[in-house]
Amino acid sequence: MTGLLRKPIAHFIRGTCGSTYKLSYAVCGFVLEIDIKLVSNQEFGTMVWDAALGLCQYFEEQKLSFSQKKVIELGAGTGILSILSLLLGGDVTITDKPQLLKQIELNVFANTPSSCRARVTIRALSWGFDHTFFPSDYDYILCADIMYTLASVPLILKTLLHLSNERTVIYFASTMSICRKLISSGYETLSQHFNCDLVYRYENKDVNLYRLTKRT
């Protein structure tokens, strides 16, 4: 299926010493206010990527619920996708580099009621290195725009193989224009171990959404 990634309700709300601003996104009946860093050397984790917005919109269009489901996100960045999954009922583990966890925590606390917070864990995860400290019983794994270097692909694969089981559904979204050849090659690698189905494409932003399940 194909469609258009709609323009989010996103506007400047405030600035803090010129280094951060807040954007507002309406999705699934919630308004998420996400702090964005303007100046950072961790650029991959300090903006809301189109692939994450694509998955948010897909969850809304499909009326997905994560109630009583274990969810983990790899490379969560600002945390918007994990926050939505938490609000949709999931028991959510949010992971990224250690230096990004504080910003994720701030966004989680700004967008979720206290009643949700017993269901969220925020942890560092280095793909391919400390993934074995996490369980292998997740119902859903979320990945949005995390294939951006050739070296990352085998590390992502190793991590996904550990975290998943035969019942796990992996939603993997990519903005293909970031590096079409690299990303296409990455999906070919993943497809050797996972059934990899293109479930949606947002033509206007060149975002592909895939549903992966482990080959048996």
Predicted regions and their residues:
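S-adenosylmethionine-dependent methyltransferases
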Residues: 1-216
